[in-house]
UniProtKB/Swiss-Prot annotation:
Belongs to the ribose 5-phosphate isomerase family. Substrate binds at residues 32-35, 85-88, 98-101, 125. Homodimer. Keywords: Isomerase. The active site is at 107 (proton acceptor). One of its GO terms (molecular function) is ribose-5-phosphate isomerase activity. Its EC number is 5.3.1.6. Pathway: Carbohydrate degradation; pentose phosphate pathway; D-ribose 5-phosphate from D-ribulose 5-phosphate (non-oxidative stage): step 1/1. CDD domains: RPI_A. SUPFAM superfamilies: D-ribose-5-phosphate isomerase (RpiA), lid domain, NagB/RpiA/CoA transferase-like. This is Ribose-5-phosphate isomerase A. GO terms for cellular component: cytosol.
Amino acid sequence: MTQDELKQAVAKAAVDHIAPHLEPSSIVGVGTGSTANFFIDYLAEYRNDFDGAVASSEATAERLKKHGIPVYDLNAVNEIEFYVDGADETNESLELIKGGGGALTREKIVAAVAKTFICIADESKQVGILGEFPLPVEVIPMARSHVGREIVKLGGDPVYRDGFVTDNGNIIIDIHNMDISRPLVVEEKLNNIVGVVTNGLFARRPADLLLLGTRDGVKSIARGA
């Protein structure tokens, strides 16, 4: 199977997982990226079975609307039953690196609200220790140099994502060669830097369920199992 076929398989598995639980009042949180896009396409088949969605990016909102799925502002909903999103890396504890597409802050907010966070990924994203994929950090523009210096103090190599602006109007610094053997500690240290909005480590709020696309089919891995 190609990587796209693996992504399609896990996206369909996620829809199959949540479909029996959808009610007319249900709100589904939807992530950003290529795997999330496949999820949206499959979710559209059930658009009459639930109320609507909360999107983690403008691009996701646009795709949902094209399928006729109502998109709500997060402040307008009381709860989100499921949040489904991809990842750039995942470890065995279902701690993640996300934000390759630059939507990490909104993704982290929606994940924090959701009762169940389902991560969908192909097997290339599963790693022993996080950090081979550069760790994105969303930064207030005027703090760019300061944050970069602080990242160096923590042992990382900061690289400005030139020309990229987040949906929130901020910039991204990608951290290379960072020791992330203790994801929760690193997440908190980075978030404590003045000028950082948030970083792409999902350790305080890891996934509850990982649907992993492999050559042998989709594996379902629950956190703590």
